[in-house]
Amino acid sequence: MEYGLISKFYMDHWRWKIREKHKVENNLLSTYKYILNFHYHMVHPYIRSTKGGPNRVMNSVCVEHSPCEHGNLFCECIYCWEHDGQCRGRKLDLGASTGIERRLANDNQQPGLSDLYCTETIHLATAIPERRTIDRENYVKDFAGQTVGDLYPQLQGSTGASEPIDFAFPTVGSGSWEILVRESHKHFEPNYTEEAYQSHIRSVRRRLFPEETMDNNGSQASTTEMLRDAVQRCGFEGPPNSPSENNRDGIDGTCISTVDIQSNCIVNAHCPKQGTSNQTNKRKKSTDTTESSGSKKNKSSNYQQNLQEQGSTSISDTIDIVDGELDGSTGSNRETAYYTFVLHKNNVKEDWRYIATTRAKQAPSFITFDHGDHIHILFSSSNTGGNSTRVRTRITKFLSATSAGSAEATITFSKVKFLRNYILYCIRYGIETVNIYGNKIQQQLTEAMDTFKILFENRDPNDVILEAGCKLYHEEKKDNKQKRCGQRKQQNLTDIILEKIKEKKITTAQQWENQIEPEFKIQLMKEFGLNVDSYVTRIVRIERTRIQQLIKAKTLTEIMLEILNDEYIKHFTPGEDNSKTAKCIEWIEYLFKENNINIIHFLAWNEIIKTKRYKKINGMVLEGITNAGKSLILDNLLAMVKPEEIPRERDNSGFHLDQVPGAGSILFEEPMITPVNVGTWKLLLEGKTIKTDVKNKDKEPIERTPTWITTATPITNNIDMNETSQILQRIKLYILKKSIQHRDDKYTINAQIQNKLISRPPTLIEPIHMAIVFIKNFTKIYNLIAEEDKAHTVNEKAIQINNEVKEEAESWQTALQWTMTENNEEQNENETQALEDQVLELAKEQATT
């Protein structure tokens, strides 16, 4: 078939199809295909004659942009690429008829209308009808009984049949039929090249079968199906999926395949030899169970194969364990999208390749376009963008980006809606190399490389601007870009600060100043100015409040389990000496025993206070002499509870409780209860709602907040007996009578003091030690709480522990008891062996003497 005029055989074929359309067609699938083909070729004819020469007058491609400089509607040169596919205002009617002479009709008579785009002449009637549109009345008359449902009822009656396209056939010879035939040129568009012809076919296909495509402002998934339909995939040499010696492709810092650009040609890709590494692939075992037999066979092959061969083979629908992306058939492209960001090379460590060899994790999958002093990074992730931030962070860590580089990546991060436009943008500003990295090549990245190969080989060398400065890549129009930049700028700054706050676990503005690198803060000031500090202060406050609200809703058991899950593996290593940790736990139990305090009773009441379990009891007091271990116990027990600390010096201030509103818990150090403030203290320790003064604000209410107090003297020293009894009813009091020994000094420590001293702990006491003690006695603690419930009024609003937490605590309890027993047996064996060795040495000394 010619690309210009429709041949006689072609039209005879479809006339026969029309005559046969009323016959019985038993095969449902063939019937449906026939309807699609008829609609595709007859209702929407889209092949227009190319005669007339290059000087023909052509209207604009769309209502907003000027026509192509080459007279081509779908030009793909450097100058015209940004208009193709971006405008929804395209015109289907490209102008009036040109009046070009056509060949005669089949009956060799001069046609009545010479500008009809078909080989059959529709002779003019005695009077040319004035109406050129089909109104409702004519539609009912001319299309009666001609719909798909009327002609092919089996399409709707068959089980599982898909819904046919909604169109109807006009009655042959009717007025509507004549109008459609005479105005069929409205559906024609000029085509001058093979690529333009294929592009137009795809546009008609998209109108017939709408897909998730891209628009100017939408956030739908990008796809390369249009290019893949037009030309075959162009492969290049190199095995992007072939395994290295230790099955850790891409982890050693070398790219899987590289495309070097030299002059105006493209050199075949090469795969650098993978270096060996002593690190084992921790994720290998987990991914083996999810891989299909096809992917295993593909990975185990040792021969070299190019991407074209790989594209012809089936790719298993598996999940990339590292990035959580679907790596499978073409249908998965609708669920993924492309993302990009920029990294300058001075924001990446020079030895990043060596650093990559020390990592045991799999390398992320991405493509880099080298622009000299900076690189553009392209990767695929979920279309919703929920996983894109995590993948971007993994890529920056793999490239060993500095703090300034991480900020730059976050600032320049954006979604790629038009893959072809993005690659043309990279080509326009010059490319030195194109690299693919990753332990596993995703299908989306393979399609991106195929698209790059096609566009690079068909580029115009005069359009490449090698010395031009690379501009930021934006796909919006200028007006949309200006509207977006203000909001996006604030959003980027907020995301950068919030990500850093979560990474460093910052809760105050001063921690931001102390822990954040100066280079990172300077980079933010370059991009956003001096208002960064106000953003930091506000975001830190919001994040601190969020954390407090989460902790406030948890039981002490849940918090202890979180500590174990995060810290246990650091302190108990299988096969190593864990005696120091075991000795610390024994020392904590020894501390409570020396002070005549039941440790189970103490831990149970801490859980009661934290969960607000009983009415009118909202405080716990630790009273004892200096250096008795009061702060040591509470600091480690409440480390993750994060109580608001209030020192004694604020008692004389009218705003000494302004920190309490919104706090999850409170820790008072050496407070002074006087006849003046005893009423406030009773309400606070009872759990009633009170109001307090806040500077430059109205009074703020204080809801029931768990309260802990440490004091060296009784807190009721300054009030009378009646008030004392009321205070003691609202608290749980524990008295520490012995002090912890600081040093051995025979001049300062006498016999009387020596009897009141407790030996120093074997090493630094940490929250993990208190968590082990708590969970190890979990069952006993909750049994005691059940007994205490009988003697107290239970608060109906108390925080309850759920069954999942109980099951996890019980499993941890069993594991800890077994571990501690094993460590004790090992320790006893070591001590016995040491004693035996000592006896043998003494015996040898006596024998020699």
UniProtKB/Swiss-Prot annotation:
Its main location: host cell. Residues 292-308 have a biased composition (Low complexity). One of its GO terms (molecular function) is helicase activity. The endonuclease active site can probably bind other divalent cations. GO terms for biological process: DNA replication; viral DNA genome replication. Its cofactor is Mg(2+). This is Initiator protein NS1. It comes from Aedes densonucleosis virus (strain GKV 002 002) (Aedes densovirus). The lineage of its organism: Viruses, Monodnaviria, Shotokuvirae, Cossaviricota, Quintoviricetes. The gene is NS1.
